[in-house]
Each structure stands twice: as C-alpha cells, then as structure tokens.
A protein has these predicted regions:
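ASCE RecA-like P-loop NTPase motor cores
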Residues: 8-276
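Short, small-residue-biased leader/transition segments that mark boundaries at the very start
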Residues: 1-7
C-alpha cells in the first residue's frame, strides 16, 4: 500500500518501534499480534498503520467500547462510522426510533460512497447478515430536477425501501404525499427534503426543517437510501408475511391443544405485529 502522509502520522513516524513495525508488517501474514500499546494511543496506532490502505474495519469486544473507539478515531479520520450489532432485546424499540438502523445504513452508505473509510464494530456486528454492495447500491434511488416520476410506482418503491407513509413527515424513515408534493426523510440525512411535481415532472427539490416546515436549501438532485437493510419487493414481503402467519397459526393451534393458552396467544400476537 502507499502511505498517505499526514501531520497526524508524525508523532508515530518518529518512534523507532513504530518504524520497525512498519518494516515488519509487509513480511508477515495471518493474524498479527501487537502488544505494548496503551489504550489511549490505540486509535492513533491503528490510524497510522491503516492510513492509505483503502477501507478498514476495526472490531472490538463490546458495543460501548466500539462507540468510544469510533469517536476517538474520528479525530484522525472523519470518514469513520460505527456499525452496531442487531440487538434482539431492543429490536422493538429500534423499530420505533430507527436509531440503530440509521447507524448501520450510514455505515453501509459510507462504504458505498467513500473510496477510503473506517468501520468500527463488534464481533456480533461483524456476524450480522448484510446486503452485498451491489444489492445495497442498486436499491438507492436517485431523483433529479427534470426527472419524470410515476407517483404511484414511486411511493410503492419508497415502501419497499422501508419508508413508512405518514400524513406529515416528522421523523427519519417517513414519507408523505399531498397532491404533487412528496416529502421524504431518509435515515442518512439530518433534514427531510421535498419533491414538488409539475404534472409528472420533478419541478423542484429542497431540504426543509421537519418542525417548522421551512425550506433550507434548493437541491439539484437527491439520493434516497433504503430505510432498512433488507430491501424486499411487495411480492417478497407478502409471501414472507403469509408464511409467518401460517407457521404462527400452526404453533398457536398446537399450544392450545396442549392447554397452553397464554403461549398460544403470544405466538399469534407476535406474528400479527410482524404482519402489521
């Protein structure tokens, strides 16, 4: 790899131990253990070793440690993202808030857009299934002023991307349609944006404040990233829901036959909630 020299590298470059390490790394293969570095210096050490090597991934043992490491590493490299694992215990709360999903989508976006970035995660996060780069990039929808849009098809596509339709956009992951005005709040953006149509042609695009509804900036084009990691078509989603409901019905009936009415109710309720 070709090192990109930076002023932040200089403290490390002056250390004989670091220079010896750099000289040895190209000759080594497999898992390499480096010891003797205090915790406070680890982000600097990792940055200095990995700088100029394309995309990098840092894996640590615990979520809180990963968050702290991402924040500390950001001092050396602004193109860093924290990728949280999918926590089953807090799955329902994240459905409502989209906080963890937004962090994962932002990490995927960074990998798709940046030539060089650093992702910080845990072993659990590393084992999470995720879409291939081609699948993720192909799901991104670009809209530019002058484009022709089929409104019905476009809103159906937003639903497939994981966006929830609402009367008025208030939080990320929502969209609304009022006549020829489409409001969308991507998980990857700080503010929603408004697409105004003249008949079926995009007349204008601008970002706006979700609370005041005031316009912020006119835009020539926008990229709409998915609001979920697994993008399904309506047909795939309907087939999956039908299968879940059918299996839940079988489980519920079996539990009722065993006089386990409470467990049967919970199984059916969980399936109904997923279907909604």
């Amino acid at each position: 790899r070709q090192r990109q020299m930076c002023i932040r590298d200089r403290p490390m470059q002056g250390l004989k131990e670091f220079e010896d390490l750099e000289a040895a790394l190209p000759k080594l293969s497999g898992v390499i253990q480096i010891s003797g570095c205090i915790d406070a210096a680890k982000p600097h050490m990792m940055y200095s070793i990995g700088n100029g090597s394309g995309n990098r991934i840092i894996v640590t043992f615990q979520e809180q440690k990963a968050k702290e490491l991402a924040e500390e590493y950001r001092f050396f490299d602004p193109n860093v993202a924290y990728y949280p694992a999918k926590d089953i215990l807090f799955y329902q709360s994240d459905i409502r808030g989209n906080v963890l999903t937004a962090e994962r989508i932002n990490a995927l976006k960074m990998m798709a857009e940046k030539r060089s970035c650093t992702i910080v995660t845990t072993f659990d996060g590393l084992m999470n299934p995720m879409p291939s780069p081609d699948q993720f990039i192909s799901a991104v929808r670009k809209v530019a002023v002058g484009d022709v849009i089929d409104l019905e098809q476009f809103t159906r596509h937003l639903a497939e991307l994981g966006y929830e339709k609402n009367y008025q956009v208030q939080t990320s992951g929502e969209f609304s349609v009022r006549g020829g005005i489409i409001d969308i709040f991507p998980l990857t953006e700080e503010n929603p944006f408004r697409i105004e149509l003249w008949d079926d042609e995009v007349d204008s695009i601008r970002s706006f404040d979700a609370e005041s509804q005031r316009s912020i900036e006119n835009l020539d084009e926008v990229h709409i990233y998915p609001a979920c990691e697994l993008v399904l078509t309506k047909e795939e989603r309907d087939a999956g829901i039908a299968r879940i409901l059918a299996e839940a019905k079988q489980v519920s009936e079996k539990l009722r036959g065993e006089m386990k009415t409470e467990e049967a109710y919970r199984a059916k309720s969980a399936a109904d909630q997923v279907a909604e």
